[in-house]
UniProtKB/Swiss-Prot annotation:
It is a single-pass type III membrane protein. Belongs to the iodothyronine deiodinase family. This is Type II iodothyronine deiodinase. Not inhibited by N(6)-propylthiouracil. High levels seen in the metamorphosing tail. The keyword Aminoacyl-tRNA synthetase does not apply. The keyword Transmembrane helix applies. It comes from Aquarana catesbeiana (American bullfrog). Pfam families: T4_deiodinase. One of its GO terms (cellular component) is endoplasmic reticulum membrane. The gene is dio2. Plays a crucial role in the metabolism of thyroid hormones (TH) and has specific roles in TH activation and inactivation by deiodination. Catalyzes the deiodination of L-thyroxine (T4) to 3,5,3'-triiodothyronine (T3) and 3',5'-diiodothyronine (3',5'-T2) to 3'-monoiodothyronine (3'-T1) via outer-ring deiodination (ORD). Catalyzes the deiodination of 3,3',5'-triiodothyronine (rT3) to 3,3'-diiodothyronine (3,3'-T2) via ORD. Catalyzes the phenolic ring deiodinations of 3,3',5'-triiodothyronamine and 3',5'- diiodothyronamine.
């Protein structure tokens, strides 16, 4: 099968999901518009904010590119985990490197323990909303598993496809590696993670994003350098509950550090 035929086949596979996402964005904009008009009619103070549409040319490009990333990703369930280039953001007293030091994703994987890798950015609402659940998971299972947060390209930068609603802070597009690491540090200032979770940033070539088909957010589990769990494409199929279920089935529900330590 020629390259053109492969690209055409992938495009045909992408189209249904792409159009369903566009329909969702159109419905979302319609609901927000009606709410905005009603608030204006009621002269509510909350109606004075700027109304941001989601179904925009920039939004369509981002959604389409997200499906392309997912379609062309290197990672496969049961396959080898890509050893992508990343940059240290936190040290956490680790001997593997200091903040700002280049490293590889699999540097954080041990020989036997599973490595839970959570990909996302501060401007991705589903990722942010599940950070507390992720932190709790780290605390409960850090005795039997390792955890890594990979900060990627912004999902909704303030100078790009900005998300509607009031955000605790805004982040612009990353112009260099310093911008990306600064955004990751800003996230950690507001959402403190347990010290057992390491934090790295994707390089500016977005090689990790491309290899794992992240785009907005994704989660996977690496064990013995193989992908033993591969979460769905975000935002609609980003599900930390499935990760918890995998850990519970593998290690049991009583995997907290204290309990595991006493049982040993």
């Amino acid at each position: 099968m020629g390259l053109l035929s492969v690209d055409l086949l992938i495009t045909l596979q992408i189209l249904p999901g792409f159009f369903s996402n566009c329909l969702f964005l159109a419905l979302y904009d319609s609901v927000v518009l009606v709410k905005h008009v009603l608030l204006q009619l009621n002269r509510s103070k909350s109606s004075h904010g700027q109304w941001r549409r989601m179904l925009t040319p920039e939004g369509l490009r981002c959604v389409w590119n997200s499906f392309l990333l997912d379609a062309y990703k290197q990672v496969k369930l049961g396959g080898d985990a890509p050893n992508s280039n990343v940059i240290h953001v936190t040290d956490k007293n680790s001997s593997s490197g200091k903040p700002g030091t280049p490293c590889h994703l699999l540097d954080f994987a041990s020989s036997e323990r599973p490595l839970v890798v959570n990909f996302g950015s501060a401007t991705u609402p589903p990722f942010i909303s599940q950070l507390p659940a992720f932190s709790k998971m780290v605390e409960e299972f850090s005795a039997v598993a390792d955890f890594l947060l990979v900060y990627i390209d912004e999902a909704h930068p303030s100078d790009g496809w900005a998300a509607p609603g009031i955000s605790s802070y805004e982040v612009k597009k990353h112009r260099n590696q310093e911008d990306r690491c600064a955004a990751a540090n800003k996230l950690l200032e507001q959402y403190s993670l347990p010290p057992q979770c390491q934090v790295v940033a994707d390089c500016m070539d977005n090689n990790t994003n491309a290899a794992y088909g992240v785009s907005f957010e994704r989660v996977c589990i690496v064990q013995r350098q193989k992908i033993v769990y591969l979460g769905g494409k975000g935002p609609f199929f980003y599900n930390l509950q499935e990760v918890r279920q995998w850990l519970e089935l593998t290690f049991g529900k009583k995997a907290e550090s204290g309990q595991t330590g006493t049982e040993k």
